[in-house]
């Protein structure tokens, strides 16, 4: 499963800039729909297009590894099959 670190990146940016950052602001700056951002934040494993990931990396000035990580699950169907 893919895990997004969007909440953490928002918190870091809020701390650095000493102001509140809303989903609406991120949506406006990135062009990503508010509903999509909400799903990324609130629904673990939500699938989104790579263009959105690119826009978020640009907005937060971060590498992809800071935005997403892969979390192995015991019943992970996306894991490669053994020979």
What kind of feature is each model-predicted range?
Residues 68-83:
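Short, charged recognition helix plus adjacent turn
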Residues 1-25:
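A short, Lys/Arg-rich alpha-helix, primarily the initiator
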Residues 18, 45-48, 59:
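Helix-turn-helix/winged-helix DNA-binding modules
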Residues 51-66:
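DNA major-groove recognition helix of helix-turn-helix/homeodomain DNA-binding modules
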């Amino acid at each position: 499963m893919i895990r997004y670190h969007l909440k953490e990146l928002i918190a870091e940016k809020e701390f650095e800039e000493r102001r509140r950052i809303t989903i609406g602001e991120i949506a406006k700056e990135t062009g990503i729909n508010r509903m999509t951002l909400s799903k990324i934040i609130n629904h673990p494993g939500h699938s989104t297009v790579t263009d959105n990931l690119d826009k978020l990396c640009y907005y937060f000035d971060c590498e992809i590894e800071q935005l997403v990580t892969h979390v192995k699950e015991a019943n992970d169907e996306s894991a490669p099959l053994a020979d």
